[in-house]
């Protein structure tokens, strides 16, 4: 139970950082040819939205433990992708007017949400690597399809009367932030793995201790799961 919650938080933060980093790495390659920068508060809010909505989606999938919970949780994660993207675009300051194609905006939201809805049912179908990889690929497809469709919806008309805020974050500093985010994802994954290994070792030691106590008993002991015998102690085995 405890490790389940730990992995939920680790997964939410690492996935949220991954979604956020993917968007802003793509934004670093986007050059409108006029001065631009990023509003710090909205950039931070876009990261928080990605993490919180990913956590909410994963929690729904785990708590509901049903097909509906998995699909709805995946849709929430997909909605988090769209929320993060448009908050990130709201943070983008440029010396010009930003125009949006409403049809492509709606299409981008639907793509992210619908493909995201398929990612959790696939990734959490069972513990096999095949479905884990399938879920990861679907989540990647949700991120990429949303991002490129959404970027196709934007047009920028240069306007020299509009100025970028002096407090806006330049692209070079954003690159540093993305690098830190990527490093954080790796650290969180390693930390979660270390905690999981420690918990498994503790469980194994506790099982060995209980087995030793059972074998020390004079009476024969039999542990069953329904009609199936799971284990017996030495006294029962000699009967």
Predicted segments with their positions:
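Individual alpha-helical transmembrane segments in multi-pass integral membrane proteins
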Residues: 2-91, 102-114
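Alpha-helical transmembrane segments of multi-pass integral membrane proteins
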Residues: 7-15, 77, 126-149
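Membrane-interface transmembrane-helix boundary segments in multi-pass integral membrane proteins
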Residues: 102-105, 164-187
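Juxtamembrane or sensor-core-proximal signal-transducing alpha helices
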Residues: 119-125, 178-208
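Hydrophobic transmembrane alpha-helices
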Residues: 139-168
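PAS/LOV and related PAS-like sensory modules
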Residues: 206-227
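PAS/PAS-like sensory domains across diverse signaling proteins
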Residues: 227-228, 238
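Conserved hydrophobic beta-strand signature of PAS-family and PAS-like sensory domains
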Residues: 229-233
